Structures are given as structure tokens and as C-alpha cells.
Amino acid sequence: LAFIKGNYTFSNASTFNPYSIHIQIEKGEEHIKANVILNYNHHLNKKKRLAVRGYFGFVKTNNNIYDIQMSAWNGSNDYMFSEKTLVRDNKNINYIAYNQQLLIKEGGLKHNTNDSLNSNNILFTISTEYNLTNRFRLYAEAGINGEDYAYGSGLRIPLLRNMLNIYLPIYTEDGIMKFDESYQDKIRFSIKLNL
């Protein structure tokens, strides 16, 4: 498999209200993708911030492995093997559910969505995050693929200076989460290691 990928980033890293714009194009034998990602961090006061991520993507493909994902990626979505993941398939040899580690890619919704919400054409998502306390961040997000939509909200718990993040979904397009034994399968996490 051969891929060509190009990107351009413009960022304003000012102390107050920094933002960045990322433009990416990806071409493979069976697909072409293009997207624009906007990240904006609005300072409400000295301690409170509202972070916003907007995503607009386009894909042209007949192979659903290259569809734009509504949810954040897991290891099995990384078809270019460019990300660090604990598990890349669903064999579960590490006793970690393969879909619980997330990579904020494409749509980036923190809860797992049905594959029917992925797109082989266009996808738009927006997510916001507010720092409630030093330990808890409240997030809300929504996305549309041109026909159907998904949305959700929950808590993010940053640990170890944001190297480990735990995502606890509370509400999604399917309603309020059931906090029973099955809830542990809905919890997602991300790991950021600079090796």
C-alpha cells in the first residue's frame, strides 16, 4: 500500500485565545481524503477555558476502510500504522478492549458510534471542552455526515500531565448511559507518549 500525505498548519500561539488551522490531504490507491481542522482555546478568565475543535472532511472512496470516522479512531482504524497504540486488532491479547483506546482523528467523537454514521463523502464535527476543575473537564460534541448525526457529552479526566486521559461518556445520541456492569466497556482512554 502506498500513500501520499500532505499537510499545512497555521497557528497563533499567543498567550490568550490561541488557535491553529490544519489542512490535510491524503491520497492512496483506493481513496482521496481532504480535511480542515480548527482548534481554538478561549480564555474565559484566569482559570477557566473553553477549547473548541471543528472538523470538516471529504473523502472519495469505494472501500469502507477509508470512510471518514465519526468517532475518534482506535488502533484498528490506523491503516497507515502512523500512531502509537496498545492494540491494533480485536484479538484482545492484552485484556484491553481494542476500541477503548482513542486517537483524536477525523470526527473525533469520544464515544463509539455506529459504523453507519461514518461517511464515504463528507463529515462535519464540533467538540467543546470546559475545565470544571483541575481534575475534571466537561466535553460536549456533535457531528453530521450529510444525512445522520451523532452527539454526546461526558467528562475527561487528565492524568500524569495529560499523558493519560480517561473519557467517561454520560449522554449520547442513544440517550443517557446506563451505569451498570457494561459501562466499563464505554470508557475510553488516550495515551500521549513522546518517545
Spans of features found by a protein language model:
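C-terminal outer-membrane beta-barrel translocator/porin domains of Gram-negative envelope proteins
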Residues: 1-131
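Membrane-embedded beta-strand positions of outer-membrane beta-barrel proteins
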Residues: 19-23, 52-54, 136-140, 164-168
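Conserved C-terminal beta-signal and adjacent last beta-strands/turns
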Residues: 124-129, 142, 154-158
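Active/binding-pocket-proximal capping segment
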Residues: 138-146, 155, 171-174
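Outer-membrane beta-barrel "beta-signal"
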Residues: 155-163, 170, 182-195
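Short proline/glycine-enriched turn/loop segments at secondary-structure junctions
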Residues: 177-181
